Amino acid sequence: MRSRPLDSIPSSSTVLQRLVVTSVLIVAGFASSTTAQVRMVNWNIARLNGDPQAIEEVFVAMADDDVPGFATAPAVLILQEVTNSARVSIENILGDAIPGVPYQTATFTIESTENGSGGAQMLVYRSDLLEEIPAGHRDIPTGAGRNTDRWQLRIRGSDDDGGVLWIYGMHLKASSGSSNAEIRRIGAVAIRNDADTLPVGSNIVYAGDFNVYGNDEPAYLEFLSAGPGRAEDPLGTESWSGAFNAIKHTQSPRLEGGSLVGGGLDDRFDFQLLSPPLFDGDGFSLMPATYRSFGNDGDHYNVAINTGNNTYFPGQTARSNGLADALHDASDHIPVVADLMVPGLLTCVLDDNLGRVVSGGTSSIIALIANARQVVTPEAASPLEYSAVGDGVLVGGGDGVAPLLPSFDTQSFSLVAGVTGEFTASVEVAATSAGVSQPEYDLACSGFGIRPAVPSWSGGSVVTETTVEAESPADAGVIFIDVPVHNVGWSDVQSALDLDVASGLGGGFFVWEGLGTSVEGEPGLLRFGFNTAGRSEGAYEVDVTIQATDEDVPGETTHYISLTLVVTIGGVDPVPGDFNGDGLVNGADLGLLLGAWGPCRGCPEDLNDDGVVNGADLGLELGFWTG
């Protein structure tokens, strides 16, 4: 089905009902969703040895960073070198920097060896969007007296592995030399041994300060090696050394050391390596061109990041310089930032009180399906595929892709043939994309089933074709032909029959009245006219198709019956008082006379030609009466 915005609902008999249902869908969807995306950050925060005000300014700038074309507060922060005493300070700084965002610290563990060797790993996440599964946490010894932490986060409302992020936050052994590289490799092996036990196809993030010096270092290659936990590098596996690759570097934003490490910006120590499912464009997935070394403009190789002007924010030198100064004073690493697409949030609605419904009719019971995930840019919403099926009482439905609200996708259902009287039914909508929040709905409804109308030219049986003949003298003016239409077998469990359109008329034939009539137990009357003026003697006929519909309810069906009208002119003396030309003087003609009552010179109802239709003409009419 094709998705449609709210203002494109077609005009139909159920527009009001559809608008109400759509409004419910939108309100329910927005009420159940928080405006969020997953901006993921890792940053070696250097034991808080930097300027706390500068650290706060960096956090502020992270939330305002619109270099990818949009800005959003970080949803996941993976921090290194966090001491036991620094943890609370970091929480306070973050709360001041990005107020109103409910941040939660995930399981935090620190051993005495970690506290004395640079600090531990800390994970902070948005609790309105994500939740930690504490049982998924694990400490993995990875050398240099430090542990790598494994955390398990799930997007709220999801119940499958596609909604889970496995995050390994690490700080591998520092310094060059083969012995240090070997310690890093052993640590990477320990992490991979753990990751390879996770469910196949898991969303895995390896993030932190790797301290690797090149793309040929064994620890780096270990993360990329074959196996269930294999990772890919968002920046590719080519060399990152030298000025040509300055845009990739993360350490150090300072030349001078002091309480922080100096040396200039010439190393790529900080990484987010991702498992293949995080590149597939489904569920959690890296958004193209969003992986970046925060504040690095690529023009500060082996110098301080605030040397001269910085151009990280294109065309905004002052803003870029302000960030560069904050990065310089905050830490001896700069953050790595990446933005992820997020799985959908399914929402759908079906009118729960359908009222009267034509069984076996058209598919006009509509379920509306949408993705209620509120993202700051549509590109951040992963496709939300779904399937919608009826329970057998309702039939129809199908598969589709749910668009972001306020647009919606539609699936149509009909009431199965043969259902009359009160009924209950349901539609099951289930997400088929991975990681979707609120992935299943069982939409219940009820109504009153009715049979389709049965149009007929006869009241005793179904007759859908007939011929009606009339005779008239020449130049008798307009004659009328009355044809009854029946709704055979009507009862309170059968639809009324609405007479809508008469097509095919022409050549002097026209419909005078009867269209718009709703036929139930009593027949409706179609009155056709034929203008005999100027017609030669002979037979005139026309084939007419009557389009009728069931009453204006879900399942409304269109019906067609056909009629041949034949008028023969000549060879018949006019019958005085027969105003409708049917050869009889009866109540129909009396009605025409009364309708012309009053001054009416030249009217056929003025039988005594005195210019007035009055009691004298009524007396003559009764004298001509044939019954």
Feature locations, PLM:
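Acidic glycine-/aspartate-rich tracts in secreted/extracellular proteins
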Residues: A46, V82-N84, L129, P277-D280, ...
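Structural motif
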Residues: P68-G69, G264, G418, R535, ...
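Bacterial N-terminal signal peptides that target proteins for export
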Residues: R2-S23
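Cellulosome-associated attachment modules in secreted, modular CAZymes
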Residues: N371, V483, V567-G627
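Sec/Tat signal peptide C-region and signal peptidase I cleavage site
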Residues: F30-A36
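Repetitive helical segments and hydrophobic/amphipathic motifs
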Residues: I26-V27
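Divalent cation-coordinating acidic motifs and surrounding scaffolds
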Residues: A36-G344, S382
